[in-house]
C-alpha cells in the first residue's frame, strides 16, 4: 500500500506577520496583543470556520505566544520557534480536517526527524539538513499518512533551525529523496506560472 507524507507551508502572509510580531515584542509595542489576535489567531479561526473545525488543538501553541508576549522577553531560540509556527498551525489544521473524515493520519513535527548541523541560530537558512529515515518510516508503519510542518528542523542542542524562504518545498524534497518516493508533487495556490520574469521581460504570459 502507498503511504503519503504531506508537507505544508504557512498560510500566505502569516510568516511575515510572525516576524513583525517578534519586532513588536522586542520593542514592547502596545499593539502587540491586538496584532497577535488580528493577524494570527483570527486568520486561523477564519480557516477553521470554513472547515468546520474547533481550534482547541492549537491552544498549547497559542499559550506559548501569549506567555512570550506577556513576558516581553525573547531569545533567539524563541524567535526561531515563533517564525516557524505558521507551518505548525497549517499542519495541525489539515491533520484535524483529515481526521474528521476518518483518515488514518497524524501530525508529526519535522523536528522529530530532520536534523541540522548549525549551532549559531539565525532567522534565515541554518546550514545543512538531513533526514532520519527510520523515524519517519516507523511513524508511517501504523498510519496511511503523516502531516508535517515544513521549513524547520532541529540541531544537536535541540534548538529549532530554519531552512529559509521556500523551506517547505525544501523539506518536501529532502524527505522525498531520502524515502526514495515514487512521486513528489508540489501544490501551490497560484493561478499559473509566468513564461518569464515579468520584472525583467515584456509580454510575459501565464
Predicted regions and their residues:
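Nucleotide/pyrophosphate-binding catalytic subdomain
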Residues: 1-206
